[in-house]
């Protein structure tokens, strides 16, 4: 595995299996996301140079594509019968990009929030976007 592939695999924010509707709409971050953020915090010293190097755009593009693919598959499975106000590919790539940008900022700022707090915050952002996209109301 190349160093680029190793870096890209580091950015899997959860299990590579589909997330259920309940998990996608939960207020709690999935354990896999928390574990990934912890791992990224521990790996910050070698991640930063790679994310700022000459291949960073290629690396980030591949990370975004992989995350978007995972997110879109989960959305399609969890909301198979529902109509989205936002095309699912647009929704998935937007959530993937937001998560990558959040992690970049977090690493650049020397982790001003714990991995747990960051994961919970992103889960809430993701939940709000998904709920809006599918027109879901609070019960």
Please give the residue ranges for each predicted region.
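Short, hydrophobic secondary-structure boundary micro-motifs
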Residues: 48-50, 59, 115-116
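Hydrophobic alpha-helical connector segments
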Residues: 17-46, 56
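Amphipathic alpha-helical packing segments from all-alpha helical-bundle domains
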Residues: 31-35, 39, 55-80, 89-101, ...
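C-terminal peripheral helix-coil segments that are non-catalytic and often amphipathic
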Residues: 73-77, 88-89, 105-139
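HTH DNA-binding helix-turn interface
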Residues: 1-16
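Solvent-exposed, amphipathic alpha-helical segments
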Residues: 18-20, 46, 97-109
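Short linear capping/connector segments at secondary-structure termini
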Residues: 18-20, 50-57, 80-85
């Amino acid at each position: 595995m190349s160093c680029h592939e190793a870096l890209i695999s580091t950015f899997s924010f959860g299990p590579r299996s589909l997330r259920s509707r309940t998990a996608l709409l939960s207020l709690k971050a999935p354990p896999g996301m928390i574990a990934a953020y912890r791992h990224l915090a521990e790996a910050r010293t070698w991640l930063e140079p790679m994310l700022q190097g000459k291949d960073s755009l290629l690396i980030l593009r591949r990370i975004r594509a992989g995350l978007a693919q995972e997110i879109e598959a989960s959305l399609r499975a969890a909301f198979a019968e529902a109509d989205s106000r936002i095309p699912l590919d647009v929704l998935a790539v937007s959530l993937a990009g937001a998560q990558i940008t959040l992690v970049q900022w977090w690493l650049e700022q020397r982790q001003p929030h714990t991995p747990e707090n960051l994961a919970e915050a992103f889960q809430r952002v993701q939940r709000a976007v998904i709920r809006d996209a599918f027109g879901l109301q609070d019960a």
